[in-house]
């Protein structure tokens, strides 16, 4: 089954099934992970992430209610969603994963106004220091687990490399990093030889299966290790001061989209 059939038929159908089964209204549904980054393999899963509002009754319980949905379909479509209030609380805390959601280049559905409204607020709530900690943790995790010799899954090396390059973007520009890996490489890698080696790995990844092992070029490997060590030092020197923001605008957005969808 080709990707266009997934995007245009299967995924919209699954989103409708989620709304019916869980009695919710989806505000935003996007692709996350390797397909959004642009280094999916031939057999990569579909990782959908979504934001939703519940039926009116959900909002009138004195007990805390479950505010997440996770559902795996048998055709390798994996969905995970957050209720709008949870999503906004994480947005307020500068959650890097949520910022990736709202900047995903693959949007399956967006409620009119929601995506633009949330993006107008991101300058107040995005904190590069928190993002640096997050992506530094990602590449250190993949380094500790997988990078002991040059032969390793391409997927893991690209995860590792992406974490490093996001830290470089954050250091150089201090803004929300691009989701597409090629955009990140173009903006942060000036050495043409290294850039060409990354492009070659990316091509191999797209042509291979998810867990294929391929040798990583030693020059690229050494370059990445050097960058990783440098940004480890940058992160260790950070002294983040995240000031508390008032919730008025987020509360208003929450009220507006809940009210709009439960009338």
Regions found by a protein language model. Name each.
Residues 28-31, 100, 170-172, 177:
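A structural signal for short, well-ordered beta-strand segments and their strand-loop junctions
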Residues 61-140:
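A basic- and aromatic-enriched beta-loop-alpha substructure that forms the phosphate/nucleotide-
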């Amino acid at each position: 089954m080709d990707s266009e059939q997934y995007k245009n038929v299967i995924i919209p159908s699954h989103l409708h099934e989620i709304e019916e089964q869980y009695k919710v209204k989806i505000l935003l549904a996007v692709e996350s992970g390797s397909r959004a980054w642009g280094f999916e393999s031939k057999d990569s899963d579909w990782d959908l992430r979504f934001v939703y509002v519940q039926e009116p009754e959900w909002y009138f319980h004195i007990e805390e209610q479950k505010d997440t949905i996770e559902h795996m379909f048998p055709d390798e479509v994996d969905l995970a969603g957050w209720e709008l209030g949870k999503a906004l609380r994480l947005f307020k805390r500068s959650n890097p994963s949520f910022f990736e959601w709202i900047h995903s280049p693959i949007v399956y559905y967006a409620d009119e106004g929601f995506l633009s409204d949330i993006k107008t607020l991101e300058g107040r709530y995005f904190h590069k220091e928190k993002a640096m900690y997050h992506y530094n943790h990602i590449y250190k995790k993949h380094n500790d687990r997988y990078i002991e010799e040059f032969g390793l899954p391409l997927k893991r090396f690209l995860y590792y490399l992406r974490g490093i390059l996001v830290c470089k973007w954050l250091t150089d520009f201090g803004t929300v990093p691009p989701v597409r890996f090629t955009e990140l490489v173009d903006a942060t890698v000036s050495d043409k030889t290294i850039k060409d080696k990354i492009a070659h790995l990316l091509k191999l990844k797209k042509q291979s299966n998810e867990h294929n092992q391929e040798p990583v070029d030693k020059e690229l490997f050494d370059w990445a290790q050097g960058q990783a060590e440098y940004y480890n030092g940058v992160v260790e020197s950070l002294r983040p001061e995240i000031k508390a923001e008032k919730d008025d605008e987020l509360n208003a957005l929450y009220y507006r989209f809940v009210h709009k969808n439960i009338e």
